[in-house]
Structure formats: C-alpha cells, structure tokens
C-alpha cells in the first residue's frame, strides 16, 4: 500500500524523475505484485543500495522498475500465504501452484525471467538464497527493464527518428561500460557526472529531442533525495 501511495503522489505532483530506494525483508506476495504493477505503470528507477536489502516479496517490486541499480543484497525463498488454511501437503501445493502461476505471469509482463519463480520454489521459506550479479542480470532483475525498453524504443523511433535511437544505444553501451557500476560509498551522482561527460561524443543533447536525450533530467539540476520505501 505504501508503494502505491508513493506512485500516486508522484503522478499528482507530476514528478518526472522518480527514484525509489528499496530496503525491505519482504511482505505479502499479492501485495508486492499489486505494488509492482503500480510502479511499472508510473515509471520508476529502483535502487538497492550497498547498505540495503531486497528479500522475498521485495524482489517482485524490484522486477517492475523501468531501471534497476543494485549494489545491496537481493535474496529469494519460497513464498507462503501467512493466512493459509492448508492442512495437508496437497492443499498447500495446490495453493502455491495458484500463487506461482500468478507470479510467473507477473514476472513475464514485467520483463523478468519466470525462472526466478522456479528457483524460489527450491529454497525453504526459513532460508534465503542471495542472487549473484550474474544471476540478477540473467533473470532480468538488474539494469534496464526489457519490456519498458521495447516500449521506449518504439516511442523514440516514432518521435525522434532511427538515428537518435542508434546514437542512444551507442551511448547506453558506453555508459554501462564506463559509468554505471558505482563503487560502495561513491554515490550515484558520480555515475551521472560520468555519463554527462560522455554525451557530447554521441551528439547529445539532441536538438530535435533534447528532453529525451540521455540524462537530460540531470543536466540543469542536482538530483533530489530519493524516496525511501519498503514492501512491508
């Protein structure tokens, strides 16, 4: 509910650059998916900082961000309904099959791999499996959201032209290679400053589409403090 309220407030205040810091041990799976859909519909960058965690149901919210920046710990395990009325393994299995079917549909529409849900099933609820950097990339939980990236490419090609999209792709690769990974304690602003220095070499800001040029929101103003939130 908190994340949904934050998303609604950002819409009402017309906040264009939206950064949400996640730091949560989890919560209810259905609530997390509902909150994630609200995040996905309102265009947020989600961060898990080096001193933060995103465990259990929090991972579902992480999947929904337009972009994800992770330096903290992301962990998964089996998710159960705390209010479950199951009394046998068969009843619990049927209940979990329904939950995980919804979860897989949710992950798929948010550009994350459904393999995340399968992996969750193998980790007992009382334990936790931390995901490596490679796994976060493989499962579509870190960096740019694949589905949102497709939508953005379609829009930019329509409004700014194919050359703009090609140059932006080249810039994005250079940014990932040179600037994206932030050392603990360095601060995300260092990555943005690095990216701003790269832009001119790729013809940005673009005269036709200056507002859609990479990091345009950071050009003239310092970044505001991000909103802090968890999934509890």
Predicted feature residues:
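Small-residue-centered hinge/linker elements
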Residues: 1-16, 22-29, 71-115, 119-121, ...
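Glycine-rich beta-to-alpha active-site loop
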Residues: 31, 40-83
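Solvent-exposed, polar/charged alpha-helical surfaces in well-ordered, non-transmembrane soluble domains
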Residues: 4-11, 33, 37, 60, ...
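N-terminal secretory signal peptides
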Residues: 1-22, 26-43, 113, 129-134, ...
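Sec-exported extracytoplasmic/periplasmic mature domains
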Residues: 11-15, 40-44, 63-67, 79, ...
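Low-complexity, Gly/Ser/Thr/Pro-rich intrinsically disordered linker/tail segments
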Residues: 149-232
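Charged, glycine-interspersed solvent-exposed loop segments at helix/strand-loop junctions
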Residues: 82-170, 174, 178
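Solvent-exposed, acidic/flexible segments
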Residues: 1-3, 25-32, 51-55, 67, ...
């Amino acid at each position: 509910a908190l994340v949904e309220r934050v998303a609604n407030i950002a819409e009402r205040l017309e906040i264009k650059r939206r950064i949400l810091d996640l730091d949560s041990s989890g919560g209810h799976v259905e609530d997390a998916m509902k909150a994630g859909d609200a995040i996905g519909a309102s265009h947020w960058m989600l961060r898990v900082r080096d001193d933060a965690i995103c465990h259990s149901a929090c991972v579902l919210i992480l999947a929904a961000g337009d972009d994800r920046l992770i330096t903290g710990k992301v962990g998964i395990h089996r998710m159960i309904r705390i209010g479950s009325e199951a009394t046998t393994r068969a009843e619990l299995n049927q209940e979990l099959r329904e939950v995980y079917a919804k979860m897989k549909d949710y992950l798929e529409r948010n550009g994350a791999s459904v393999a995340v849900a399968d992996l969750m099933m193998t980790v007992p609820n009382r334990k936790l499996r931390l995901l490596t950097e490679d796994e976060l990339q493989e499962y579509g939980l870190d960096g740019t959201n694949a589905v949102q990236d497709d939508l953005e490419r379609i829009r930019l090609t329509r409004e700014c032209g194919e050359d703009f999209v090609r140059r932006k792709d080249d810039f994005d690769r250079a940014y990932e290679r040179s600037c994206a990974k932030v050392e603990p304690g360095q601060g995300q602003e260092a990555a943005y400053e690095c990216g701003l220095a790269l832009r001119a070499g790729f013809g940005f800001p673009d005269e036709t589409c200056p507002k859609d040029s990479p990091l345009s929101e950071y050009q003239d103003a310092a970044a505001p403090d991000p909103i802090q939130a968890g999934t509890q």
